[in-house]
């Protein structure tokens, strides 16, 4: 394994198996641990299930117990959409850490919020303004890397996530899914009653 020739940590992420009838997570995790993996992340759904079923956190608890004696940390993943979800996963599974996936789309603040909840028992949710501003930062950086047209196409779905929970967001998201230029995104916020935010001296 890479650990034999590199000082960099190597982590492995697995699902519970290909189908419910053929779970393979125990064998996969054991092989990873024996090969020198520094940590194993488990998403307790089968490949065939996709996101159709709820994540089986019981598998996370089982894997954590199995690898505890081997000194290999276990990261849990699946159905973690809020700081409260993350805390509950840690408490109920004994996992060493939580890996966010879809829960972080449109809400990069979830990492800070979760840390605050775990450290203090409370957290300050990010405002709608902060989330939209973060969305524009991501859009602009993506445009710098991939070009404006490609970035705007890619950000349509992401921006819908950023605007989730915003008053009037349903109508706003219709405008966002048709955006082809950064100016279209700004115009969507100008034309929608959902938000009136200032970004870089301009009104969205």
Where are these regions (language model features)?
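Flavin-dependent oxidoreductase catalytic cores
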Residues: 1-204
